[in-house]
Design a protein with these regions (language model features):
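Bacterial N-terminal signal peptides that target proteins for export
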Residues: 1-9
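Bacterial N-terminal signal peptides
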Residues: 9-16
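Serine/threonine-rich, low-complexity intrinsically disordered segments
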Residues: 10, 21-22
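N-terminal amphipathic/hydrophobic interface segments
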Residues: 22-252
Length: 252
């Protein structure tokens, strides 16, 4: 049995939650379905063990989310779940988190997912090895490399990233690489909106196409309409000439 409760606590501290979160009324995690139920105080003094049967997975609900898995350890007194094997956490019709292993705290609404993690929303899929998700803030965070695929056209790699679910926006940091069929963008920080495909970058940024190289330190690029606006030390190098300026509008 894994122990990531301390990781959840660390996540809590790192995101600087206010005490008002804990003053809110807490709802209990509910076990909707389990094929087998085991309660052994000697083997698992604080937990009930829930296991799927041949036909259906374990089903768990809490305040607008549904979780399914092959097996779960339910710590009722702590309002806490450890889920194992083909884990899925669904929030409404817009967000689905899949992993090999997941922890969920019903009091703080914090989620930790690990192993083949996929975060799906209508416009994109994020792939990483571990992910924290704060349901109060509707923010998810990873720090062990991630890959985002949007509409099979835009692919973004980075070492760190944060997803803001309410804005449908990702903030990618460190070794950011946005790839499309027509160009690549390399930047330190890139804000990317999954609905529109618009990307906003800051810091030294290179945009490479088949016939040009663009450099700037601030700006945006619209991946849907293939145009952009570049500010601060902007430069476009074509094969036969170069354009420099404080601000450059670019439309292919």
């Amino acid at each position: 049995m894994k122990k990531h409760i301390l990781l959840i606590s660390g996540f809590l501290l790192s995101f600087c939650f206010s005490t008002t979160i804990f003053a809110q009324e807490k709802t209990k995690i509910k076990i909707e379905r389990a094929g087998f139920f085991e309660k052994d105080k000697n083997k698992y003094p604080d937990a009930s063990v829930l296991t799927r049967d041949k036909e259906q997975k374990v089903l768990i609900s809490h305040d607008g989310v549904l979780m399914t898995c092959n097996q779960a350890f339910f710590y009722e007194e702590k309002n806490f779940i450890e889920a194992f094997g083909e884990v899925s956490l669904k929030q409404g019709d817009t967000l689905n988190l899949k992993a090999n292993y997941l922890e969920y705290n019903g009091d703080t609404k914090l989620v930790y997912a690990e192993g083949n993690v996929i975060l799906n929303e209508p416009e994109s899929n994020l792939y990483t090895e571990s992910l924290y998700f704060d349901r109060n803030k509707q923010e998810a965070f990873y720090s062990e490399k991630g890959k985002l695929i949007r509409n099979l056209s835009d692919t973004i790699y980075s070492l760190k990233g944060t997803f803001f679910a309410n804005e449908k926006k990702y903030r990618f940091e460190t070794n950011v690489d946005l790839r499309t069929p027509k160009y690549n963008i390399y930047s330190d920080i890139l804000n990317y909106f999954t609905e529109s495909g618009k990307s906003y970058f800051s810091g030294p940024t290179d945009i490479i196409t088949d016939d040009s190289k663009i450099y700037c330190e601030f700006g945006y690029y619209d991946t849907m309409n293939d145009n952009g606006y570049f500010i601060k030390n902007s430069e476009i190098d074509f094969e036969e000439y170069q354009i420099n300026g404080d601000s450059i509008y670019f439309d292919r």
